[in-house]
């Protein structure tokens, strides 16, 4: 993958991460919320965060001195 593809993929992942954050907050604030669904969404959000960090590290050039 080249840098442009990584940047595009990162933007999609960040958007999904933000969207999940909003959904989770909405569900937590709801009077009757499904704890199992919230846990699944939080797990997905954490996976997205890990994927974002991995892709961001690919954009940083190796500086072997």
List where the protein language model places each region.
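Extended, charge-rich alpha-helical interface modules
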Residues: 1-65
């Amino acid at each position: 993958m080249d840098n442009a593809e990584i940047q595009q993929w990162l933007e999609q992942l960040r958007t999904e991460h933000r969207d999940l954050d909003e959904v989770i907050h909405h569900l937590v604030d709801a009077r009757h919320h499904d704890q199992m669904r919230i846990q699944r969404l939080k797990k997905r959000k954490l996976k997205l965060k890990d994927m974002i960090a991995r892709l961001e590290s690919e954009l940083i050039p190796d500086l072997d001195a």
